[in-house]
């Protein structure tokens, strides 16, 4: 037991050190930007206004580059509020929103997210090498790496949500009331960063009720989520008179849009954008789209790994992987259905994330992939899996640097 703990501690330390080094090197190449802050961190701006006793953004008309909602003549931060809460101590210490070391904070959140991935895999019974593999794949071999380089509002929302989701899955495997409550709180906080994580929370709560057949027995799992939902609904109502509106519908771009923020008319065009290829010309130059993304598994090959593993299990004569019980249904068909549903819901949004490298919205599906991975913890990465992970890290390092000049 002591030896196992030591091995896990060593592997986790090594992985976090690699991620920290990669981010420090990136910011060095970017011109020494680690301690700087992005002008797009409207969470910090909201925190500054909270500290001044306002739930709106004072002089919002001066921040023309930010995605601010306009409602009854006032300007409001238009994203769910949880990351803004995290900014409060930093803004209070710095004195103003633009003075915080935003990129360093983003790096810290990325390390916490990576720690959540490792802890989730470790509690699921995976070996240290497998835990390290998946942590590297998520933190450096996907769009998560590029989003970890900047404290812009969009990136903070996704990295925070993903981190909360993985820590939620970690606690959900604990099997007692205290850890059920912690899992519920973490997943609810993820919803407070990215609303589509409500699907993960709802499925987990539903699965707990199905297994325990008693509302009383799932109260520890239910209460934190209910309290968090009530707080966020009250905050929405105080600002917009609606418990479900956090501001995006009042963004000028969606007010002007013929079909609004969400519509079925966006579904097929956006799905096709997730299939746009990355090509190589005769001079060896890569070509890809940087608006609304490209082929979803090119920058996020974790999907490719899951698909290949799933297909191999269907081949005749292939040895089945040992399955274990996890806090959510881990059948391949169920996980695939949830990923498809999440993708369709995402593609019903007017945009797919705008300016970007890869397909960053697809990162929101990672917890579902890990539900499947956690159900099969005895698998260990072979040389081909490590090669895929290495290629993914190189491609995403390239992408992060490429976007510096775009």
Which functions belong to the PLM regions below?
Residues 1-406:
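Membrane-proximal envelope and lipid/glycan-remodeling enzymes
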């Amino acid at each position: 037991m002591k030896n196992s703990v030591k091995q896990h501690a060593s592997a986790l330390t090594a992985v976090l050190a690699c991620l920290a080094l990669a981010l420090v090197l990136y910011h060095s190449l970017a011109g020494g930007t680690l301690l700087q802050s992005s002008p797009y961190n409207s969470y910090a701006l909201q925190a500054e206004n909270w500290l001044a006793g306002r739930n709106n953004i004072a002089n919002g008309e001066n921040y023309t580059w930010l995605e601010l909602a306009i409602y009854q003549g006032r300007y409001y931060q238009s994203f769910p509020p949880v990351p803004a809460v995290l900014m409060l101590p930093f803004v209070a210490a710095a004195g103003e929103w633009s003075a915080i070391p935003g990129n360093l904070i983003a790096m810290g959140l990325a390390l916490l997210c990576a720690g959540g991935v490792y802890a989730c895999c470790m509690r699921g019974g995976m070996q240290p090498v497998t835990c390290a593999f998946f942590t590297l794949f998520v933190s450096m071999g996907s769009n998560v790496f590029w989003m970890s380089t900047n404290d812009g509002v969009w990136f903070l929302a996704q990295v925070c949500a993903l981190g909360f989701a993985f820590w939620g899955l970690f606690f959900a495997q604990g099997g007692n009331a205290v850890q059920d409550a912690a899992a519920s709180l973490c997943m609810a906080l993820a919803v407070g960063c990215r609303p589509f994580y409500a699907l993960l929370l709802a499925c987990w709560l539903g699965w707990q009720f199905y297994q325990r057949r008693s509302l009383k027995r799932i109260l520890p799992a239910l209460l934190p989520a209910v309290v968090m939902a009530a707080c966020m609904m009250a905050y929405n109502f105080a600002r917009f008179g609606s418990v479900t509106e956090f501001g995006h519908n009042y963004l000028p771009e969606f007010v002007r849009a013929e079909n609004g923020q969400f519509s079925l008319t966006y579904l097929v065009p956006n799905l096709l954008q997730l299939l746009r290829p990355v090509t190589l010309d005769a001079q060896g130059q890569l070509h890809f789209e940087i608006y609304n993304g490209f082929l979803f598994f090119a920058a996020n090959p974790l999907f490719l790994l899951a698909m290949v593993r799933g297909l191999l299990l269907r081949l005749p004569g292939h040895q089945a992987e040992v399955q274990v019980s996890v806090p959510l249904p881990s059948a391949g068909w169920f996980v695939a259905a949830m990923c498809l549903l999440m993708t369709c819901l995402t593609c019903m949004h007017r945009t797919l994330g705008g300016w970007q490298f890869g397909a960053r919205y697809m990162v929101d599906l990672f917890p579902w992939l890990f539900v499947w991975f956690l159900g099969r913890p005895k698998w260990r990465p072979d040389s081909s899996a490590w090669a895929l992970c290495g290629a993914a890290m190189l491609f995403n390092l390239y992408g992060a640097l490429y976007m510096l000049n775009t």
